[in-house]
Amino acid sequence: MLIPSKLSRPVRLDHTVVRERLLAKLSGANNFRLALITSPAGYGKTTLISQWAAGKNDIGWYSLDEGDNQQERFASYLIAAVQQATNGHCAICETMAQKRQYASLTSLFAQLFIELAEWHSPLYLVIDDYHLITNPVIHESMRFFIRHQPENLTLVVLSRNLPQLGIANLRVRDQLLEIGSQQLAFTHQEAKQFFDCRLSSPIEAAESSRICDDVSGWATALQLIALSARQNTHSAHKSARRLAGINASHLSDYLVDEVLDNVDLATRHFLLKSAILRSMNDALITRVTGEENGQMRLEEIERQGLFLQRMDDTGEWFCYHPLFGNFLRQRCQWELAAELPEIHRAAAESWMAQGFPSEAIHHALAAGDALMLRDILLNHAWSLFNHSELSLLEESLKALPWDSLLENPQLVLLQAWLMQSQHRYGEVNTLLARAEHEIKDIREGTMHAEFNALRAQVAINDGNPDEAERLAKLALEELPPGWFYSRIVATSVLGEVLHCKGELTRSLALMQQTEQMARQHDVWHYALWSLIQQSEILFAQGFLQTAWETQEKAFQLINEQHLEQLPMHEFLVRIRAQLLWAWARLDEAEASARSGIEVLSSYQPQQQLQCLAMLIQCSLARGDLDNARSQLNRLENLLGNGKYHSDWISNANKVRVIYWQMTGDKAAAANWLRHTAKPEFANNHFLQGQWRNIARAQILLGEFEPAEIVLEELNENARSLRLMSDLNRNLLLLNQLYWQAGRKSDAQRVLLDALKLANRTGFISHFVIEGEAMAQQLRQLIQLNTLPELEQHRAQRILREINQHHRHKFAHFDENFVERLLNHPEVPELIRTSPLTQREWQVLGLIYSGYSNEQIAGELEVAATTIKTHIRNLYQKLGVAHRQAAVQHAQKLLKMMGYGV
């Protein structure tokens, strides 16, 4: 829950001076990106902006305290303030902030600006007491905010010092409105107005001006002088002389003498006790001070002018002026040291009663009350964990003695999940092992099962599927049906283990079960994970259309639950890119991979390895080797500076080896082959992929026999495990081996198998990537005219893709080629005497490339009847009677010109 007072603009008080000259300056605030109000404490920053904000509707107010250095808390309140200003316009951002479903503050702000693009009215966001922010991540995020905020949004920041928000750049670009302490200082006229409002007997203008000069227009000093004069302890001028030259850091003695010592003991204790509250209402005051009618007491303190501020329009919430509040808290530590723990305990209890456990934890920590802290955590820790209050939980758990954790194993489990969320896998197992060693009877029952579920998740994350399987099974055997979260975890892990072992049908069933349980209990990140795993399994089985449909369900879940900024979103768009690439939708595949990189923009560059490999695959499929080389340089740099899972390495190696194949770089392939990992098994898609990389390198090096052994074993495994997509890939590589080894009939046999299997997988780019060798074979198959209709159609599509992206055979019949051909001494006399037109040469090239008449018409964007005319003319000029003879004639010309065909 959010504390309402932190989102309420302060109420404009009676007897305050309206700062007309400053309000006039602020009237143009909508022309600036940032309005910055800076001064030491007590110069009236908040009062000024509350006057300016009066009557404005499109304004959000966020009052900071020390706890707002937690990024998640800062995000929640800031988005809530924007929602306040826009009447709930930014619903997606609000949900993301509430559920902590964003990768970083900057990515959350980026989503905010997308939603605000449809908000066209002027909009203001006030952040008060920004000097309390010390978290550099928040500073950096707010710099991003200011750089990218919409033109109709003005950010208003109040701070005691110059914040780290790129002020100089804004100033140079005239996008900054500044008001500092010199402008905030009261003028003679304002001081006179102030005293006239506060004192029953007016003072002379000259006297008022001298007092104002003595304290340099400092508003707090003027307020203290008025308070002293009302209490008749000193004349106003005497108080002014005493305050002259001092500042906020030297006020303590003065405040003791002039404020605390001039109120009765009951009021003094009320002030000291209530000051421990960062914000307060009737219930909190009654519980903390022990006085009845807390609201009435607060209003009385306000009337006495004791630096109390209303925080909302209802008058329910109050807080002390920061300067006075800090002073009172220091005095409380000195004067009520013995009572202070009990006061904090009372505050914690009252905050708990009002449903604010995070505020209660703050006071339990201050009280040093481990028992209270333990009880709060036992009741609310998992809710705080699910809302990503990780820093607060970590601080709280560190404050508990180890014995207290042992007595409450749920808290040990919580601490372990905290470590897991931070990828501290080794520490998780150490902590759980220590707890099991020291907690009696923990090695059986529900808690042990929950430990095992977490251990199973750690094991699979750490690349240990056998241990993960053992632990997940133990957990599922021991967990009661109602322990849904740990059951979801264990079921998911077991499904992932079976995926790794190639038991795809069983794995798919478990992932579907995980999805069902996760949806039932609103555990959305596991629901998304299970859908991604289902898609991968279906892809591996060769059911790419069903994999696509499963991905659509995952995208829908992301949109409905606002999961766009979870790292898992990158996983989803990456496997979508792989599917699009397989179907030769290269532009879409590239866009999808780039969106994955964008999701990970706030993470370490190493996390982008897989998407970068996908971009390289797109370049390779297009035959764009220059771009591929540039991207490969970055990929190889990332490989050398990180630790990766085996499937990540396999995907990275794949594009490297294909590039070496395309460029004939045998030295690089040989060097890689000497050092690369050779897995013990090949029972899943990423191990199959690594062995396929090895076989491709061996083929490039002419090591056909060992490559054939590898590929035959891969095919045996793929058939037995129904890894149909891998089988399709293996057949294509085996085809290349046979072709290069001169075993043309074997090459044709496995190519026919690959084409038939592609009717199920839909593969296109896997054929295209093999380039000219594939094009030659497909042309021959098409010319034989024996392919079934589906395979014939696919072969023609693959040829078109090869021709488009790799500039193969028909590209040789361009103007430069024809000119060189006609000047060749061995050119047939018939072509010299009756030369083809440029269009007829193009048609000949497309006939040679395997295109049908309809496809040639589509490629050249002319009518089919026109193509028939061109074909009739070129047959006559070449002296041939049919298509097969034209293909053979073109082949002779290419050989004559030195092209290996």
UniProtKB/Swiss-Prot annotation:
GO molecular function: ATP binding; DNA binding; DNA-binding transcription factor activity
A Pfam family reported for this protein in Swiss-Prot or TrEMBL: TPR_MalT
InterPro entries: P-loop_NTPase, Sig_transdc_resp-reg_C-effctor, TPR-like_helical_dom_sf, TPR_MalT, Tscrpt_reg_HTH_MalT, Tscrpt_reg_LuxR_C, WH-like_DNA-bd_sf
A Gene Ontology BP annotation from the UniProt entry: positive regulation of carbohydrate metabolic process
The UniProt record lists the keyword Transcription: yes
Domain HTH luxR-type: 829-894
Binding site for ATP: 39-46
Regulation of this protein's activity per its record: Activated by ATP and maltotriose, which are both required for DNA binding.
Entries under PROSITE patterns matching the protein: HTH_LUXR_1, HTH_LUXR_2
Keywords, sorted A to Z: Activator, ATP-binding, Carbohydrate metabolism, DNA-binding, Nucleotide-binding, Transcription, Transcription regulation
DNA-binding region, residue intervals: 853-872
SUPFAM superfamilies, alphabetized: C-terminal effector domain of the bipartite response regulators (SSF46894), P-loop containing nucleoside triphosphate hydrolases (SSF52540), TPR-like (SSF48452)
Self-association and partners: Monomer in solution. Oligomerizes to an active state in the presence of the positive effectors ATP and maltotriose.
Function: Positively regulates the transcription of the maltose regulon whose gene products are responsible for uptake and catabolism of malto-oligosaccharides. Specifically binds to the promoter region of its target genes, recognizing a short DNA motif called the MalT box.
PANTHER family linked to this entry: DNA-BINDING TRANSCRIPTIONAL ACTIVATOR DEVR_DOSR (PTHR44688:SF16)
Family note: Belongs to the MalT family.
Name the UniProt record assigns to this protein: HTH-type transcriptional regulator MalT
